[in-house]
């Protein structure tokens, strides 16, 4: 082995040992009570940075009211608490700001398998990831069964997991998260998404969970276990030596085709943003009515994955080729993502030759903004990243300006741009729900107020008037080590909305109930198709 190889091996070995030690240290810290003074310092740290860095802190709560809540929290810190007990108290105060992007994450215990087990666990599926959940009217339902157990009936009520009722978790953790403003449709979708995390906080790392179900007045219990990937077999048992040796040209030709197909599939996944965990594309075009290519459905699951310029170009070229007259844009469950992605989509939907997607964002400080953006990074990284930080700061300063005593910065889409030449000009229908959030709400607002589309579903989880996001640093609290994320920019859609704190409202309100979810029915899409058929 050459010297560089020896050094790399030694470095890898040392890092592995340090990683194991760090995991043990981290898990011990979670179970170590924090001193009262340490918690007081963390509260002061949060309060100071919140007042200094948040661009629209008092939109939904008065300054005196928020100050009183922090003072009250400090006064209740009279005895040591575990970090996650402290998180519950502090997060409940932060949620009163009513900004959905702001989160204070609890510390979740880590599991660090060794050797071959590490690879096995990385390729495995935990018990919670095999199940789908639907939370409605204070009841938890099984919406997906990804296990090998066919006796798990989708649509069953989940009464308890390892003896813990989901209603108790909702009561405990509901005060720690919020939507934008006074919206409530986001809450149920957020809870069912966060549910596995809450159970892990209560139970720790589990390879199996006992679940009590209720179905048609009967109760049954099942154990859901971690599913490991089957080990690869080098050769089939009982295969003769003669069978394994058949080197001729025809099998080689057959092997070439799947390789080409695999390569093409890989490219498609990169362009349209394949999410391996959810097994879906970020952007997917389909034609919901068999034999009718004039009606198209564009499902945009997020604005985070894929190559939007190439993806939307291909999609809208296809719409033009098929002479699509009715386009249904499905934004349900879209939690947002990159501003550049959603702006690109909007440029294909707007009717005018020119457009502006968002207004310049309000910020607290022109000079300090680039340094706020990196505030959550560890101290040792600053010298390493300084060659990149300084040029980035200069670019950031060139985008900022002041007007009437308020500081602003330009964003992607905050200047007037040309619409796409092959933009869609037909009828547009948009599907929304409580999971339509952040950037997805921005485009929904512009399409709604701009009278470009008809909306179906339920009120969006994100506020129609905008959101505080843009750049979201994650700060580590000095003593509790809790991770605190919040936005630095007040991002508003181009079209002004007077009422703050409510989402984009549907023109036709339709809510999917649990039976629809379980049976795979989509009454929202069905209603749109009925209206199109009448036209």
Where do the language-model regions lie?
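Alpha-helix-centered segments that form part of catalytic cores
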Residues: 203, 274-279, 388-426
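Extracytoplasmic/peripheral linker and loop segments enriched in polar/acidic and small residues
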Residues: 65-66, 70-76, 378-405, 419, ...
């Amino acid at each position: 082995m050459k010297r560089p190889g020896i050094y790399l091996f030694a470095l890898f070995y040392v890092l592995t040992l340090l990683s194991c030690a760090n995991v043990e240290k981290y898990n011990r810290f979670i179970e170590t009570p924090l001193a009262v003074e340490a918690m007081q310092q963390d509260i002061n740290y949060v309060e100071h940075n919140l007042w200094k860095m948040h661009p629209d802190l008092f939109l939904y709560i008065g300054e005196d009211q928020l100050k009183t809540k922090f003072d009250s929290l400090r006064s209740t810190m009279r005895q040591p608490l575990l970090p996650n007990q402290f998180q519950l108290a502090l997060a409940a105060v932060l949620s009163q700001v009513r900004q959905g992007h702001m989160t204070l994450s609890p510390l979740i215990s880590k599991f660090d398998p060794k050797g071959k087990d590490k690879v096995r666990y990385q390729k495995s599926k935990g018990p919670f990831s095999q199940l789908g959940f639907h939370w409605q009217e204070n009841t938890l339902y099984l919406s997906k069964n990804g296990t090998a157990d066919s006796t798990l009936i989708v649509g069953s009520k989940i009464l308890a997991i390892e003896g813990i009722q989901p209603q108790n978790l909702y009561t405990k953790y509901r005060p720690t998260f919020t939507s934008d403003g006074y919206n409530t449709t986001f809450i149920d979708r957020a809870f069912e998404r966060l549910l596995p995390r809450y159970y892990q906080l209560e139970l720790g790392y589990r390879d199996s969970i006992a679940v009590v179900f209720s179905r048609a007045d009967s109760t049954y219990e099942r154990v859901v276990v971690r599913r490991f990937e089957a080990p690869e077999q080098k050769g089939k048992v009982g295969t003769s030596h003669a069978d394994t040796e058949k080197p001729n040209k025809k099998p080689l030709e057959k092997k070439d085709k799947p390789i080409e197909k695999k390569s093409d599939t890989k490219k498609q996944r990169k362009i349209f943003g394949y999410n391996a965990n959810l097994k879906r594309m970020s952007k997917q075009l389909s034609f919901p009515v068999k034999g009718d290519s004039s009606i198209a459905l564009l499902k945009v699951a997020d604005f985070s994955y894929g190559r939007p310029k190439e993806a939307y170009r291909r999609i809208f070229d296809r719409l033009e080729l098929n002479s699509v007259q009715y386009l249904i844009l499905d934004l349900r469950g879209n939690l947002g993502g990159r501003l550049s992605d959603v702006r690109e989509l909007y440029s294909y939907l707007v009717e005018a030759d020119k457009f502006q997607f968002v207004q310049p964002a309000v910020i607290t400080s022109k000079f300090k903004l680039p340094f706020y953006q990196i505030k959550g990074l560890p101290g040792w990284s600053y010298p390493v990243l300084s060659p990149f930080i300084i040029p980035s700061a200069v670019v950031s300063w060139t985008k900022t300006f002041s007007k009437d005593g308020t500081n602003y910065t330009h964003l992607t889409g905050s200047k007037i741009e040309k619409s796409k030449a092959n933009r869609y000009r037909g009828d547009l229908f948009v599907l929304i729900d409580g999971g339509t959030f952040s950037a997805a709400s921005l485009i929904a607002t512009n399409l709604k107020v701009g009278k470009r589309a008809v909306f179906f579903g339920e009120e969006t989880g994100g506020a129609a008037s905008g959101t505080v996001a843009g750049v979201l640093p994650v700060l580590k609290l000095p003593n509790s080590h809790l991770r605190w994320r919040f936005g630095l920019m007040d991002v508003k859609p181009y079209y002004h909305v007077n009422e703050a704190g409510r989402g984009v409202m549907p023109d036709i309100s339709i809510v999917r109930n649990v039976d629809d979810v379980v049976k795979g029915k989509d009454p929202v899409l069905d209603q749109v198709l009925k209206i199109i058929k009448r036209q």
